[in-house]
Curated annotation (Swiss-Prot):
Biological source species: Escherichia fergusonii (strain ATCC 35469 / DSM 13698 / CCUG 18766 / IAM 14443 / JCM 21226 / LMG 7866 / NBRC 102419 / NCTC 12128 / CDC 0568-73)
Family membership: Belongs to the Tus family.
Residue ranges of coiled coil: none
Name of the protein: DNA replication terminus site-binding protein
GO MF entries: DNA binding
Pfam families the record matches: Ter
InterPro entries documented for this protein: DNA_replication_term_site-bd (IPR008865), Tus_dom1 (IPR036381), Tus_sf (IPR036384)
Length: 309
């Protein structure tokens, strides 16, 4: 019964999110568009989801075309809404900003609507990732059994509202996920895998078992106090740097989806200055500051697991 209730809440929360998004988009369309600039990125094809991105060619869209793409993007939740060649495992990204004229009465209404949408998105994600009690690999099948074709990352992704920005500049951010581990924690993880033998493409079951045993021995041979860490690169992300003249401060936002800028003309706010997003080229990335890295030796490549020398 509890599992049935969870599925019911999964579906109910998602339908509420869909309705809230549709209503919000209709509300935005009633407001005057001041300026819009979004940047479409090449689609990620099936089988290319995990390939490193060395170059990204950006296409710019302005005005009502940009607005149309942005509003459609907010409601892009299913693979049926995209090319059949595009991967369903990679979320669609559309950095940029759409700016609308608001006043003292309409701004709080729009902000409240976005707050409600984001609450539903976070509740939906919590149902899938926490309340389901399922491991990561099993969640995909569970969600798609009840919501076939759902792009879960698009469903999780919240909307970002900004108020009266003076300037917006776009760029790219390179990051790593870093997690420190103890030797015994890694051994426990490998031991768990050894006790549930399976085949992992392109290895047979026996080959995979032998590979795990070698990895186990490699870790077991390390001193107990060895410093281990997972250092996994995250795909380059579009970001927006927003300058607020009144507060004299800059705020950086992740920008996988268009920012929604509300311009309150009652307060004398004007149309912001919006920069462009340049093509990404990994070979020409310049770091403002790159600290001296700790010497690390890769010990289990598939886990991005390193040991400090």
């Amino acid at each position: 019964m509890a599992r049935y209730d969870l599925v019911d809440r999964l579906n109910t929360t998602f339908r509420q999110m869909e309705l809230a998004l549709a209503t919000f988009v209709a509300e935005l369309e009633q407001h005057r568009l001041l300026i819009a600039r979004v940047f479409s990125l090449p689609e990620v094809k099936k089988e290319d989801e995990h390939n490193p991105l060395e170059q990204i060619e950006v296409k710019q869209h302005l005005g009502t075309e940009a607005e149309s793409l942005a509003l459609r993007h907010f409601r892009h939740l299913f693979i049926q809404q995209q090319s059949e060649n595009r991967s369903s495992k990679a979320a669609v990204r559309l950095p940029g900003v759409i700016c609308y004229q608001v006043d003292d009465n309409t701004r709080p209404l729009l902000e409240e609507h976005v707050k409600r949408i984001n609450e539903l998105k976070m509740a939906f994600e919590h149902i899938v990732t926490v309340e389901s009690g399922l491991p990561t690999a099993a969640r995909f099948e569970w969600v798609h059994r009840h919501l076939p074709g759902l792009i879960t990352l698009n469903a999780y992704r919240t909307l970002t509202v900004i108020n009266d920005p003076a300037t917006l500049r776009f760029g790219w951010a390179n990051k790593h996920i870093i997690k420190n581990l103890r030797r015994d924690d890694v051994l426990a993880q490998l031991e768990k895998s050894l006790k549930s033998p399976r085949s992992v493409y392109p290895w047979t079951r026996e080959e995979w078992q032998a590979k795990l045993e070698r990895e186990y021995q490699d870790i077991a041979s390390l001193p107990q106090e060895a410093k281990l860490k997972i250092k996994r690169p995250v795909k380059v992300q579009p970001i927006a740097r927003v300058w607020y003249k009144g507060d004299q401060k800059q705020v950086q936002h992740a920008c996988p989806t268009p920012l929604i800028a509300l311009i309150n003309t009652d307060n004398g706010a004007g149309v912001p200055d919006i920069g462009e997003l340049l093509n990404y080229d990994a070979a020409n990335v310049q770091h403002r500051y790159k600290p001296q890295a700790q010497p690390l030796r890769l010990i289990i490549p598939r886990l991005h697991l390193y040991v400090a020398d």
